[in-house]
Design a protein with these regions (language model features):
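Non-catalytic interaction-recognition regions
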Residues: 1-226
Length: 226
C-alpha cells in the first residue's frame, strides 16, 4: 500500500500504517464481495432505525422528535456494536443483540445518557450548585462513580496509542454501569442532606459531560430523550 500511494505522487506514503480488522458475519453468515454475499451498511441502518422507531411507538407514542431519536439510536446501535469488539476479532452481527436496551449496547449507553439529562432537567434550579468544600463520607457507589469518571483521559490515551476504539466502548459501558448503580442506590432529588445532594448532582452532571464526550469519540449521537 505505501508503494502504491508513493506512485500516486503523495508524499505521506511513508507515514501510512495498516490497521487490520476482523471479518464480519450477519447472523452467522460471512459477508464476502467475491461471492456476492453483501449487505449494504445503509440497509442495515434503515432496518435498525425502523425497529427502534417501532419500539418507541409502543413504549412512548407521544414522544417528541421521535424520528430523530430513532435514527440516532438505530445508527448508534450498529456503530457501537461494531466498535465494542476488538478490531482484530471476527464479528457476528445480530440485530436483536445490538438493539437490546438492557445489554452492553449503544442503546443502553444512550439511555443512560438520557437518564442523566432527565435527572438534571428535573433539578434545573439546583443543577449548577457548586459542591461544598467539606469532608464528606462517600457511599461505595459514589466512590466507584468518581473513580470511573477520573479514568476517562487515561482510557482515551490507551485507545489512541493502541488504535483500538473498543477501549472507549468498554469504558463507556463501565461508566454507565457505575452511574446506574449510583442512581439506584443514592437518592438525588429526594436527598435531604444539602451537601450530599450537591455532590450527587455534580456527579450526575460530570457523568453527562464525560459520557457525552465518549460517545462523540466513537461517532454515536446522544439524544437527551429516548
Amino acid at each position: 500500500m505505501p508503494s502504491a500511494v508513493e506512485l500516486m505522487g503523495y508524499d505521506f506514503y511513508n507515514k501510512l500504517y495498516h490497521v487490520p480488522y476482523g471479518t464480519v458475519s450477519i447472523n452467522g453468515e460471512k459477508l464476502a464481495t467475491r461471492t456476492g454475499n453483501v449487505i449494504l451498511l445503509r440497509d442495515l441502518f434503515s432496518v435498525a432505525v425502523e425497529k427502534v422507531r417501532a419500539i418507541m411507538e409502543e413504549k412512548n407514542p407521544n414522544m417528541q422528535n421521535k424520528d430523530e431519536s430513532a435514527e440516532a439510536v438505530g445508527v448508534g446501535a450498529i456503530v457501537f456494536y461494531y466498535l465494542s469488539n476488538s478490531r482484530i476479532k471476527d464479528i457476528n452481527f445480530i440485530m436483536e443483540d445490538a438493539l437490546d436496551f438492557n445489554g452492553n449496547t449503544g442503546p443502553y449507553a444512550q439511555y443512560t445518557y438520557a437518564r442523566t439529562c432527565s435527572v438534571l432537567n428535573k433539578l434545573s434550579d439546583e443543577a449548577n450548585v457548586s459542591v461544598p468544600k467539606v469532608s464528606l463520607t462517600l457511599e461505595k457507589a459514589e466512590r466507584d462513580l468518581s473513580k470511573s469518571l477520573s479514568l476517562f483521559p487515561e482510557k482515551v490515551s490507551e485507545a489512541i496509542n493502541a488504535m483500538e476504539p473498543s477501549t472507549v466502548t468498554r469504558y463507556i459501558l463501565d461508566l454507565c454501569g457505575a452511574f446506574n448503580r449510583f442512581y439506584q442506590s443514592c437518592a438525588i432529588s429526594s436527598c435531604e442532606d444539602a451537601d450530599k445532594k450537591a455532590l450527587r448532582i455534580a456527579l450526575t452532571r460530570s457523568t453527562k459531560n464525560i459520557l457525552g464526550k465518549a460517545l462523540e469519540l466513537i461517532c454515536v449521537k446522544h439524544p437527551e430523550k429516548i
